[in-house]
Amino acid sequence: MTVFLSFAFFAAILTHIGCSNQRRNPENGGRRYNRIQHGQCAYTFILPEHDGNCRESATEQYNTNALQRDAPHVEPDFSSQKLQHLEHVMENYTQWLQKLENYIVENMKSEMAQIQQNAVQNHTATMLEIGTSLLSQTAEQTRKLTDVETQVLNQTSRLEIQLLENSLSTYKLEKQLLQQTNEILKIHEKNSLLEHKILEMEGKHKEELDTLKEEKENLQGLVSRQTFIIQELEKQLSRATNNNSILQKQQLELMDTVHNLISLCTKEGVLLKGGKREEEKPFRDCADVYQAGFNKSGIYTIYFNNMPEPKKVFCNMDVNGGGWTVIQHREDGSLDFQRGWKEYKMGFGNPSGEYWLGNEFIFAITSQRQYMLRIELMDWEGNRAYSQYDRFHIGNEKQNYRLYLKGHTGTAGKQSSLILHGADFSTKDADNDNCMCKCALMLTGGWWFDACGPSNLNGMFYTAGQNHGKLNGIKWHYFKGPSYSLRSTTMMIRPLDF
């Protein structure tokens, strides 16, 4: 604040003092101002112009009063009286100025207090409004911040849950990856081992192939030599067969001679036994042999009606009273029973081992009188069983050697494994069964098949351990089932009235 004051009296006194000893200086003829700073307020005093009668200062370096910056210069020859008067006047003015200053200070204090009070009131109202506005804005911002915080917390919770799930999933994936890595390592080790073994096997295989090639070449040479030998043997066999035919003719002639001799002896009644004459007749079967006094099992010669040649057969004199003519026997698989019609017709094998008597001879025997059939069976566990039929005979070749049976008994099943109502005989080259499947080819051997049927004693021979699950083996269904191949079989016949 700047206050401009004119003090006429004070100006007159200063004029009087200034004009007492100096002259008017035309350069200092204008008004002069004196400014005093007190706190925030500044005071400016207007000083009057100097009178023209005042003397000019003889020197500017002489200063009569250091406190009065604008006081006029006096000459050093002023009298002491003037100086004292001037000092007295200055003291009075100084006191007056102090009073004036005190007055101004007191008035300024009250004014400043009023101004400060008004400013404080105005500032308080403004601050209240601003505070209210700030409070409202703060509350709104707080509410928004609370909502944002809630959203952030919810989002944080979801993110934490998702992070936890991702962590669990990552842990599981890491675990699975570790397991798969371990498995891959194991597989790699196994592959390395297998590759090593394969390399070893390839080396061995190569060596074996080389060995087999050498053996093949050797075998080819051997086969060539054996082929030549076989051809030579076939030639020798052909010559031997011719010789055998000659021997057979000689044997027939000898048998005729023997028959003639027997006939002559019979006519003359020349046969002594125990001192009595008995008439000797040719043996029709093993029952005749047994009744003739030969009660030891073995090979005997029997004669057939309407057949030019006798036949060697095996007679069983031990089972169930003896007198049995054996028509089939299997025991060791040494004989192949997969043969054709002609071979089954005339028979094959050795009566002392495995053999088939022949359908033509079986027909000839069973046509003489009534016969019964007994079948002896044994499995690979040593169990024995039998089936027996009270009536047995077969038809001729035109009838395909049809089988006729009656009256089944025995321990090899409550039911008969042979067809009782009649079945034709079939071989691999003569299919007479009631099936389009050709049972003789599938089941092997010649037999009385009826849609294959539950039995085949002329099937394939299987050894122990390989006899299970064999449909084409030696089977008797109601004894060991349809796929069990038996160890041995014997078919034999005896007259019903024995």
Swiss-Prot record:
Highest rank taxon of the organism: Eukaryota
Keyword field: Angiogenesis, Coiled coil, Developmental protein, Differentiation, Disulfide bond, Glycoprotein, Secreted, Signal
CDD domains: FReD
Sugar-bearing residue positions: N92, N122, N154, N243, N295
Subcellular location as annotated: Secreted
Disulfide bonds: C286-C315, C439-C452
Entry GO MF terms: identical protein binding; receptor ligand activity; receptor tyrosine kinase binding; signaling receptor binding; vascular endothelial growth factor receptor binding
Pfam family, one: Fibrinogen_C
Positions in coiled-coil regions: 81-119, 153-261
Gene inactivation effect: Embryonically lethal. Embryos die at about 12.5 dpc, due to important developmental defects of the endocardium and myocardium, plus generalized defects in vascular development.
InterPro entries per record: FIB_ANG-like, Fibrinogen-like_C, Fibrinogen_a/b/g_C_1, Fibrinogen_a/b/g_C_dom, Fibrinogen_CS
Chain ranges of the Fibrinogen C-terminal domain: 277-497
CC terms in the record's Gene Ontology section: extracellular space; membrane raft; microvillus; plasma membrane
Secreted recorded as keyword: yes
Classification via SMART domains: FBG
Signal peptide: 1-19
One GO BP annotation of this record: hemopoiesis
Function, in words: Binds and activates TEK/TIE2 receptor by inducing its dimerization and tyrosine phosphorylation. Plays an important role in the regulation of angiogenesis, endothelial cell survival, proliferation, migration, adhesion and cell spreading, reorganization of the actin cytoskeleton, but also maintenance of vascular quiescence. Required for normal angiogenesis and heart development during embryogenesis. After birth, activates or inhibits angiogenesis, depending on the context. Inhibits angiogenesis and promotes vascular stability in quiescent vessels, where endothelial cells have tight contacts.
Quaternary assembly: Homooligomer. Interacts with TEK/TIE2. Interacts with SVEP1/polydom. Interacts with THBD; this interaction significantly inhibits the generation of activated PC and TAFIa/CPB2 by the thrombin/thrombomodulin complex.
Protein name as annotated: Angiopoietin-1
Organism placement in taxonomy: Eukaryota, Metazoa, Chordata, Craniata, Vertebrata
